[in-house]
Amino acid sequence: MNNFVKQVASKSLKPTKKLSPSDEVISLNECIISFNLDNFYYCNDGLFTKPINTPEDVLKSLLIMESFAYEKMIIKGLIKILISRAYINDIYFTPFGWLTGVDDDPETHVVIKIIFNSSLISIKSQVIEYLKPYNVNNLSVLTTEKELSINTFNVPDSIPMSIISFFPFDTDFILVILFFGVYNDSYCGISYISPKERLPYIIEILKPLVSEINMLSDEIGRTSSIRIFNSTSVKKFPTNTLTSICEIVYSFDESSFPTPKTFTPLNASPYIPKKIVSLLDLPSNVEIKAISRGGVDFITHINNKRLNTILVIAKDNFLKNSTFSGTFIKENIIWKGIYTYRIIKSSFPVPTIKSVTNKKKICKKHCFVNSQYTTRTLSHIL
């Protein structure tokens, strides 16, 4: 989490007022939850590499997660339980490694690091109870020897600035970070999460309380920082205690602030839902609209209908040099024994193949080769 905040805030000008800690210190313990998923077969040995973990890397990891719907459901459900009882430090899942930080790879499919100051017995019992229906293996819920002492600070007279991004551990939420000053080498402030649909309200609430709001914008394949507001006349932020910026996040309580009366239209979002697709999986003989941005080609409309989820095109070697920017129509075919597709019409240049019409169309199967019943999974012909 600390690495994520550092990356998200790296290009923003933050307050440098030096703060002095108060006598109160928040003491926290670390707990590591790990387990293997039943009937989960996956290996990326010799291929996987992720040296830095930028916000773009985090968004890519969340995109990869969409290809594992069942596993995502289990992990996301567990995260929702933990968010209400502890603070999430990081998540590990074999296909994408550590979600926000950089660390050694564990031996289990899933690891969740949390820090807490409540009852471990209660947390452990709820984790075990939640995971019981999913038949996970090698479940471990253990505290480490790591103890954290988080300094607290009184709210200074300086004006905070705010950064808004997606919350990496649950994209149903946004992350709101307010920076007030520094202590030693650490920035000090307070962090909140709020349901993503409350973003317009959060922005209006913050406007009279901060010097500026910088929002991380998801632009599919890249991110940018958008300055939403910059004010020279502000009110004192209604909180009494700050901490060093860390894993500690609070739920944003809108009832502590005046209700906004107007809202600024937003043409950007911290997180846009996306999913990877093969062109084989798209419907044949209908118009499809695609956009290319930041080296990523993605689909926004099918048959003149806007999609709720952006479809990122996974290209094969045949189309690796083509840029999907415009509209196209495709159809699935059997070509030289291979189940594939061809683009039959497009507003941009693509290579073409001719359908074999004078030969029996027999498709090579990956298994069940003697069966007269033929279909495909997402990966195989059978």
Swiss-Prot record:
GO terms for molecular function: DNA binding. It comes from the Viruses. GO terms for cellular component: virion component. Keywords: DNA-binding, Virion. Pfam families: Pox_I6, Pox_I6_C. InterPro entries: Poxvirus_F5/I6_dom, Poxvirus_I6_C. GO terms for biological process: viral process. It is found in: Virion. Induction: Expressed in the intermediate phase of the viral replicative cycle. Binds to the hairpin form of the viral telomeric sequence. Might direct genome encapsidation into the virus particle. Belongs to the orthopoxvirus OPG082 family. This is Telomere-binding protein OPG082. It comes from Vaccinia virus (strain Western Reserve). The lineage of its organism: Viruses, Varidnaviria, Bamfordvirae, Nucleocytoviricota, Pokkesviricetes. The gene is OPG082.
